[in-house]
Regions:
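Generic low-polarity alpha-helical segments
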Residues: 1, 62-66, 198-199
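Glycine-rich P-loop/Walker A and Walker A-like loops and their local beta1-loop-alpha1 context
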Residues: 1-7
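Hydrophobic pocket-lining residues that define ligand/cofactor binding sites across diverse proteins
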Residues: 3, 58, 109
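Conserved inter-motif catalytic segment of the P-loop NTP-binding fold
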Residues: 7-100
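Phosphate-binding/switch region of NTP-binding enzymes
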Residues: 91-197
């Protein structure tokens, strides 16, 4: 919402594989839905073809922000094809397809000054001291300017949940100190607490 408020002519390209963001969701944040291009996607290749086509037609002066919800939930086309063919084989093409997607989009995003926010999943490394790792392979990691891994705890009053305390773990950043932990508190009544992460 902040990007669209800052630039009157800005638009949001919203790629959706989880379908958890109906129009009412955008309206609740004060986002003008006529400035949102909502694109449902089913697989990595579909995202790649549409995103590259959109980026090819955007100029540096255009104010565009791109969101993907979620990369972690996207199958590869091969995985879908194998399912339709009733093949139960491991899909080794997904990480390769994601790496290709980010390899192709990164120059466009950088040269045209377009922010892209992508939701992804994490998994725990195997080992004595496992840590959360971003899924999807190295392409996502290397192309990113920032990678934040979010954790949360419930804020309760008795047994009633009043909101959440989020911790932003800065896994990678070109702008802030890596491995920082930034607390953000959000309550149902007041929203984001004004001084979260500052005190």
């Amino acid at each position: 919402a902040a990007y669209l408020e800052k630039y009157d002519d800005a638009i949001l390209l919203f790629y959706d594989s989880e379908f958890g963001s109906p129009q009412q969701y955008f309206k609740s944040f004060g986002i003008d839905t006529s400035r949102v291009l909502h694109s449902p996607i089913k697989n990595v290749e579909e995202l790649k073809f549409d995103l590259i086509n959109q980026l090819e037609n955007i100029e540096r002066k255009d104010k565009v922000i791109i969101m993907i919800d979620s990369i972690g939930n996207l199958a590869s086309k091969k995985e879908l094809d194998d399912t339709f063919s009733e093949k139960s084989v491991a899909d080794m093409s997904r990480a390769k397809a994601l790496k290709g997607l980010f390899r192709m989009t990164t120059p466009y995003l950088t040269m045209r000054d377009i922010p892209l926010l992508a939701v992804n999943h994490t998994y725990q490394e195997i080992g004595l001291f496992p840590k959360a790792v971003v899924s999807g392979g190295t392409g996502i990691y290397y192309s990113s300017d920032n990678i934040w891994i979010l954790g949360r705890q419930q804020e309760k009053k008795g047994t009633e949940i009043m909101g959440y305390h989020f911790i932003i773990n800065v896994e990678k950043s070109r702008f802030v100190k890596e491995k920082s932990k930034i607390p953000i508190s959000v309550t149902w009544e007041g929203g984001i607490e004004s001084y979260s992460g500052l005190l």
